[in-house]
Structure formats: structure tokens, C-alpha cells
Amino acid sequence: MMEVPREIIEKLEIFQKLVKKWNKSINLVSDNTIHNFWQRHILDSLQLIQYIDNKEIHLVDIGSGSGLPGIVLSIAGVAQVSLIEADLRKCIFLEKASKISNNNIQIINQRIEKVEIDCSILTCRAFSNLNTIFNCIKNISVREKFLLLKGKNYLTEIVEAKERWLFGYLIHQSITCEEGKILEVSNLTKMI
């Protein structure tokens, strides 16, 4: 398992309590995952940190409603994180949750398609399939790579995306779920 410094664990526990509190009024995570929140959500998000070589970067997290993985990665040391979320209620939650981190977090309350931004790494979790993700981010410049938390249909998503897009990828096994994969995508280009 991952070794996590005590001060980060304490901040992640505060974040966990905040998500559970807000989840009662706005649906941030599935109710049937609340009992296993640390494993299912915190560690699932935190495992991405091992694929981020330099934490002094700008990371963009799309569909960030619950702050997973964006806020978790900020708490773990990523210097600058932008969270893109269209739902204003979830942005209010993200604003409160962002105070837990010592790093720079920007909340962008817009549809992803309308956001113009540059970043080193783009993340998302429980958002959509690869084709939809790639189509949504037409105005986002990703210099280094994508770190995408995917489920059991990841191979089908790759095959379908390869019909419209050129990209390199690595598949990493999730440490939290046998079906889960981390898809590391680079050099994304749309086919003509």
C-alpha cells in the first residue's frame, strides 16, 4: 500500500467528513460507497500521485463535483489544481473543500467545452467514456498526459476512441479495485 504522511492523512480525513456531510444534500458520491469511503474514494484518487513526477505543475480535473481526484491530489502536494464543474451547488462545495489544501486551487464553474486553459496533466474520475472526454476538452491544452480512472469497460473505450483519435497509452492496475484501471494517455491528436 501507499505510505502517506500523517499531516496529509489528517487533511484527507477532514475532506472525507466534509464530503459525507454535503452528500446528504447534493449527490457527490453514491450512497452505497459511503461506508467504504477511504478505500473507494480517497485511496482511489490518491493513487494517481505515483504517476505525477513533478508536483510543481498545473493539473486540471474535469467533472470535479466531489473533488475527486482533484482536491485529494492538491492535499497530497500538487501545486496548482483547477477544478472544472458545471453544477453551481457542487462548486460551492468545492470552494469549501479547497480550503483544506495548502496549495492553489481554482474552481471554474463552466461547462468543460467552454473552458480554455493550459495544463501539464488532466484528470477525471467517474466522468464519461474516452470519446466524450476527448471531445469535451477541445479548448484545453494538455502538455504532458491524462490520468484517467477507468472501470471494467476501459478496453472497449480505448478501441472506440482509437477510431477517431491518435494517442499513446499505458494501463496501470488500480490498487483499490480489481476491475479498476488508471489509463495514462499522451500525445492526443484528433484524426482528420
From Swiss-Prot:
Binding locations of S-adenosyl-L-methionine: 63, 68, 112-113, 125
EC number, as in UniProt: 2.1.1.170
Gene Ontology MF annotations: rRNA (guanine-N7-)-methyltransferase activity
Top-level enzyme category: transferase
Record keywords, A-Z: Cytoplasm, Methyltransferase, rRNA processing, S-adenosyl-L-methionine, Transferase
Keyword rRNA processing attached: yes
Signal peptide limits: none
Main location: cytoplasm
Swiss-Prot/TrEMBL catalytic activity: guanosine(527) in 16S rRNA + S-adenosyl-L-methionine = N(7)-methylguanosine(527) in 16S rRNA + S-adenosyl-L-homocysteine
Keyword match Repeat: no
Subcellular location: Cytoplasm
Entry's transmembrane regions: none
UniProt GO cellular component terms: cytosol
One Pfam short name: GidB
Family in the record: Belongs to the methyltransferase superfamily. RNA methyltransferase RsmG family.
HAMAP family per the UniProt record, alphabetical: 16SrRNA_methyltr_G
Function comment: Specifically methylates the N7 position of guanine in position 527 of 16S rRNA.
Protein name (database record): Ribosomal RNA small subunit methyltransferase G
Gene designation: rsmG
